[in-house]
Amino acid sequence: MTDAYGNDAATSTGTIADTTNNAASGAPQRAESTERLARPLIKLAKACGLATSFIDQLGTYTEISDAALVAVLKALDVDASSDEAIVRSMTQLEVENSKRLLPSTIVATTGKPTGITLNCSSDADITASIELEDGTAFGHFALLPNLNSGKPDLTIAPDLPMGYHTLTVTVDGREGKAAIIAAPARIPVPEAVAEHQRWGWMTQMYSVRSRESWGIGDYGDLKRLLADAAEKSKADFMLINPIHAGAPIPPLEPSPYLPESRRFLNVTYIRPQDIPEYATLPADVRAQVDALHDSVAARNDESTPMDINAAWEAKRPALRLIFEAGRNNKRELEFEHFKTTAGPDLDSFATWCLCFEVWGAPWGENRWFFEKTIDDPAVRQLVEEHHDLFEFNRWLQWIAAEQVNAAQQEALDHGMTLGLMQDMAVGVHGLGADAWANPERFASGGVTVGCPPDFYNQQGQDWGQPPFNPRYLEATGYQVYREMVHSMYEHAGAVRIDHVLGLFRLWWIPQGLGARNGAYVTYNHEAMLGVLAIEATRAGGMVVGEDLGTVPDYVRRILADHGVLGTDVEWFNRVDDSPNAGDPYRAPKDYRKQALASVTTHDLPPTAGYLNFAHVKLREELHLLSEPVEAFAASATAERTAMMNRLVENGYISQTVADDVEGHVQEIVEAMHAMLTDTPSLLLQAALVDGVGECRSQNQPGTSREYSNWRVPLADSSGHVVHTDEVFDLPRVQSLSAVMRREKR
């Protein structure tokens, strides 16, 4: 997640502070004092995975307040409310650790031996077994005493297959189990990508519509976009906005980065006409469906902000008509198979949807979210009374999965190397399906994720999303994360992880303390990277991590070692990572090879707009500036001048063009993309908005209702709507495609 200048909101604070005390040297303090480290609260916090200090973006050492530490510990169900409580909690933690025979989760690297020290005496009566993911036994391990510790070491042989396995250890009749995540050391680069650089498009799927759409872009449009992008521009992938599940009925949240569930799909993007049963509807029912489509179809030609609620209010009853028409035996069996495979989480999601529809949106005066659990008798009765509606919500997920799969298959059939690149949001809505059905998976007490203060957000940011509880993830072998990642690769050839630093740590904000008063909570990045490696390898796919902003070097190094591509954006890629507008930009040869390189992101105006300072004008209009507009405009001018200098220096444009940006916008946009093609980056990306000459922003960070975020339809430089079936025939898009193919300089 980035601000308007590409600084990663939650990563802009730099690094967690080194605990080595150097205050006595006379240098500015950059570590915790010996006295602070000796405090019981600090010891307890560190034992529970909290960073008790950090270095901010300015390089300033910052200590986490006691109030924040106590509140975050409470969210982890650890009581630190008093000195006595801290002692009790630390004692309880030590007792739990002493009783645990082995870790709850073990990360193994395939091809290498894995060693685990058991928490027992070597003289104990010990038995062990490993059950592989397929249910068979794996006996290639050894138990040997460790003479130094007096505890036994269990060593698993390097031929442990990739996958999710279970280790069971019995010591003197006491049993312990551990989930084993056996992953390759590195996600392999698909052969076609390793052979030579590949490029693709980025688009907000909902913004590109056809005459068959229902006011917003849908999975039918996505299918056509992928096919035409492959055939007419020779692109190898398309990155789209997150398509996680939203609310079942209006009001719908427009931001795709604030979903109700990351496990399931957004059903508002379903194309009713592409459902097989639509073709066999009785004439009168089909006429009703068509009439509902016609009631919103005229909006497909409008360039004004889209009305996603109106679109869904027309589409949903049409889908209900198709659902009620029934299915033949073959299709019914396929639906039953989908429900069985999706498992209890599908039932939980459908139940939340049902509660939302019958009892109302779970905010304001509606208290069911807080007063009813999924096991509540009233909830079970609701499902019984409205089982058809419950089944309808499960059916919608099946149809959505079918249509996304069809889009991905269309991409591959037309020659794309990767096809669809899905975007994984950071988290979910605090009142959404995931948080209600499975509260134990998340931090308790209203804690949310955000970022501490930085250059551009002096009060910090609160994204309003509850974080995963790392203790729960560890205790359950990361099952929920495994299922989420697996479901994404079912429909994609690559996954982009928004705010990839979240695999390592997240800024937790206790309710009522404000974004300034949070604390970093660390996560087992090796476990989650292991899951990503397994799922990507099985799918033959790739992983891209959004690592914009001030990300610690060790994080980028670990991600690269695991085969996760970074993200390089031209507008943010200055020499020595300088944050100062006007400082020189990197030469293309200095970009990372293991990266997805692009000119822009969805948080910036399209490049044509950025070159014309659309971001300055918009921020001034919305009163978002914390400095005089003249100062912000001067900074933007210096930034543009520095980019023109880089383009001139490397021969992409002449000085004459650089001196007249407004008169050569398309030429400069293409020059910036030509510079991309001279980088060593494995993947390159062009934004479809840059292809058509759009100037309007899809999203303005720092706003909610002040701007039409995530509702701007695709239009050209003249403001005319561009439809799905014509976009890749436009001369401007064809020209940019030729640049990306290195056929035009």
Give residue spans per PLM region.
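Conserved, mostly hydrophobic/aromatic
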Residues: 45, 165, 229, 352, ...
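Acidic/aromatic-lined carbohydrate-recognition and catalytic surfaces
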Residues: 75-111, 123, 129-141, 145-152, ...
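Hydrophobic faces of well-ordered beta-strands that scaffold small-molecule active sites
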Residues: 199-203, 236-240, 420-422, 495, ...
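Acidic, His- and aromatic-enriched active-site or binding-groove loops in soluble protein domains
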Residues: 254-281, 434-459, 518-529, 564-576
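Conserved alpha/beta catalytic core and glycan-binding cleft of carbohydrate-active enzymes
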Residues: 334, 547, 551-695
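Active-site neighborhood of glycoside hydrolase catalytic domains
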Residues: 396-413, 477-564
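Substrate-binding/active-site clefts of carbohydrate-active enzymes
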Residues: 417-480, 484-487, 491, 506-522
